[in-house]
């Protein structure tokens, strides 16, 4: 697991942005420590973070990106 700071450095997303993405349900941390509220991310979530960044460069709104990610998850479930 990566702390929000470590994940921020790797993904090139600010910690503020990661907190916002969590708030709107776009990119939820893999784990939030109930004792201190610290957010932790799985290395596999980096793919999602990079996809979000790529879609933003194509001028998709965050709501559109959220829809794309939700449909992607449904497709992956159906294919497994």
Q: Where does each model-flagged region fall?
A:
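Short alpha-helical "recognition helix" segments of helix-turn-helix
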Residues: 7-8, 21, 65
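Glycine-centered, phosphate/nucleic-acid-interacting loop/turn motifs that mediate DNA/RNA or nucleotide
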Residues: 25
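Proline- and acidic/polar-enriched loop/turn elements at helix boundaries
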Residues: 20, 33-34, 67
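Arg/Lys-rich, alpha-helical DNA-contact motif
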Residues: 3-4, 43-80
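Short helix-start
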Residues: 31-49
